[in-house]
Design a protein with these regions (language model features):
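Conserved hydrophobic/aromatic "anchor" residues
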Residues: 3, 38, 84, 126, ...
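Non-catalytic accessory segments flanking enzyme active sites
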Residues: 55, 69-71, 79-82, 94, ...
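Active-site-proximal cap/loop segments of hydrolase catalytic domains
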Residues: 381-581
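Multi-bladed beta-propeller domains
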Residues: 16-33, 61-78, 105-122, 138, ...
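Glycine-rich, N-terminal phosphate-binding loop and its surrounding beta-alpha-beta segment
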Residues: 29, 33-59
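Cap/lid segment of the alpha/beta-hydrolase catalytic domain
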Residues: 302-414, 418-420, 427, 462-463
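Beta-strand C-termini and the immediately following turn/loop, strongest in propeller blades
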Residues: 2-8, 17, 39, 44-51, ...
């Protein structure tokens, strides 16, 4: 297997040979490496990206050796999908300034361009026999899933305009037999699909000549993803459900039409992969255990050392009444201090994401300094079903701020926090909500930290990627030229001059998701309005892989929050772990 692990504070690629229990480090780059895979010939694939997130795929033998270009002739750009076929064919999705492209070939050979488009798209998978590619568009679009032949001919299109639809991957090749050999049987492509229908997520399959068939016995009330089991036996699928900030696993036997729970420790499963021998490997965490690899059979895996934090606070789940249902908040309070406490809302990113029962170094550091911490899964968060995720009744951003305001009032009424000592801290979309809340309700928040935020919606759209432009167009109901009032109403820059509390803005010079140009536009409004603020620039992209940058942000954020919250002592040495993302 190959995986991403820690190397002196950086993300790097490693191998692990289960038969010998040994591994090695594959990459060693100054600013880290994140993406990796392993192909049918056991070659390690890794994405050689620059600090702005653009690059090319390279390969290296599993046991070591020189790095080589994975496919020649592929444009330099951002990764947008990798599919490694059992037949030896590979497909690469790349986003470049010219648009999105899919390139097909043999490892080390030339990549033939199968698709080129300016639309938002991602390569999902390649059928085992190499005869079909699945390309994902926005789940709500007319081309939610496009099936292509190797020459680029469109074979089928699945629309998501009525019911959101997305592809999850082709079934693996059947196990080899003496008569058939190791190659996949041609023409037996079976694509796993998820479709949102009547407030639930329904698993289904698509096959040539048969079309899409949903499985009525396999549906879920909250967000769920799935992967095929490899190896012998009938078609089986491993499903991972996110529900109310925690995870559950199931196995679906498609022949028997049976759904069986898979026992797991309580907490959050960040990823789960079935192994060929029927075992399941997961990345598991909870509030006091850092993420680590686990084998549900108990087999040894890399990164299984147990690092459980000492008890650093009291944890509880609170539910606050709201117009579209109760709002769920994870609350952690100091165990050795009496309430009410200074209170910090850690606002999660997304918007299609959620806070969960998982280790967060910021929670540990803030609670250790005497603060209570609230992590609210406002409307728009995943893990609570389609209706909750789509609830924007009070407008983009303002709906989420309204839920933060309700949770704040509830926590103060319960005596957990206290008036005059309530702060906000968020990254990306969480940074956006921090800025919007600080500007629209300046009377409620006493300090704020916005890390790599969306700060000016119109400028962000102009300088963003096609994928994020498509997201904004769906979220706002059009482009800034088509619905300018909607963008202005949701933009933190509209309200920036109203901020009255201390504000720290952390931004990245190479950020493609929350571009520096829109942060500069927001800062100009702050300066014009005479709003006092502090600024920290990073020479990185949106998702930095260097722990030194994350540690610097944690230090600066904790000290800034400590100064802005009365009776919250400034920590002398914050937790030296990765920044919340």
């Amino acid at each position: 297997m190959v995986y991403t692990g820690d190397a002196d504070g950086r993300c790097e690629i490693f191998t692990w040979d289960r038969s010998t229990g040994t591994g090695r480090q594959v990459t060693d780059r100054p600013h880290g490496t994140l993406l990796c895979a392993i192909d049918a010939d056991e070659a390690v694939w890794w994405f050689d990206e620059d600090r702005g997130g653009s690059g090319r795929w390279r390969t290296q033998p599993f046991d070591g050796g020189p790095d080589r270009p994975a496919l020649t002739g592929v444009p330099y750009g951002r990764p947008a999908g990798l599919a490694l076929g059992a037949s030896g064919t590979v497909a690469v999705g790349i986003r470049s300034p010219e648009g999105f492209g899919v390139h097909l070939g043999r490892p080390g050979g030339a990549g033939a361009t199968v698709l080129r488009t300016t639309d938002s798209a991602t390569l999902c998978d390649l059928a085992p026999d190499g005869r079909l590619l699945a390309v994902s568009g926005p789940a709500h679009s007319a081309r939610a899933v496009t099936l292509l032949a190797p020459d680029g001919t469109t074979v089928a299109v699945l629309s998501g305009t009525v019911e959101r639809t997305w592809a999850l991957g082709f079934a693996p090749a059947p196990a080899p037999t003496p008569a058939r050999g190791p190659l996949p049987v041609p023409g037996r492509a079976l694509l796993l699909v998820m479709r949102e229908r009547a407030g639930r997520y329904h698993l289904g399959t698509w096959a040539p000549g048969r079309g899409l068939e949903l499985l009525p016995w396999c549906s879920f009330a909250t967000e769920t993803t799935a992967r095929w089991y490899p190896g012998p036996g009938g078609p089986r699928v491993l499903l991972r459900q996110d529900r109310h900030g925690r995870s559950r696993l199931f196995t679906a036997d498609l022949d028997r039409r049976e759904l069986t729970p898979v026992p797991t420790p309580e907490g959050s499963i960040l990823d789960a992969a079935p192994a060929a021998d029927g075992d399941v490997h997961v990345i598991w965490t909870d509030a006091v255990n850092v993420p680590r690899a686990l084998s549900l059979s108990g087999a040894p895996l890399p990164g299984q050392s147990r690092w459980r934090l000492p008890r650093f606070g009291h944890r509880q789940d609170l539910w606050t009444p709201g117009p579209d249902g109760p709002v769920h908040t994870f609350v952690t309070t100091p165990a050795d201090r009496s309430a009410p406490h200074p209170l910090v809302f850690l606002v999660h990113g997304g918007p299609a994401d959620h806070d969960r029962d998982a280790y967060d170094p910021m929670v540990q550091a803030l609670v250790g300094s005497g603060c209570a911490v609230a992590r609210t899964n406002y409307r728009g968060s995943t893990g609570y079903g389609p209706r909750w995720r789509a609830a924007y009744s009070e407008g983009v951003g303002h709906t989420q701020v309204a839920d933060l305001v309700r949770a704040r009032a509830d926590l103060l009424e319960r005596g957990i926090g206290r008036e005059g000592a309530v702060g906000l801290c968020g990254t990306s979309w969480g940074g956006y909500l921090t800025l919007l809340a600080m500007g629209t309700r300046p009377d409620l928040w006493d300090v704020g930290v916005a890390v790599k935020p969306l700060a000016d919606c119109v400028t962000a759209f102009r300088h963003s990627t096609p994928a994020l432009q498509a997201l904004d167009t769906a979220l706002f109901g059009g482009t800034p030229d088509e619905v300018p009032d909607a963008y202005a109403h949701a933009s933190p820059s509209t309200y920036a001059a109203a901020i009255r509390s201390p504000l720290l803005v952390v931004a990245a010079r190479r950020d493609a998701k929350c571009p520096p140009e829109q942060v500069e536009a927001y800062l100009a409004v702050l300066r014009a309005g005479g709003v006092a603020h502090e600024l920290m620039w990073l020479d990185s992209g949106h998702d930095g892989y260097d722990g030194a940058d994350h540690l610097a942000v944690i230090r600066r954020s904790l000290r800034f929050l400590g100064r802005g919250l009365p009776a919250a002592p400034v920590p002398a040495e914050p937790s030296p772990h990765a920044e919340r993302r």
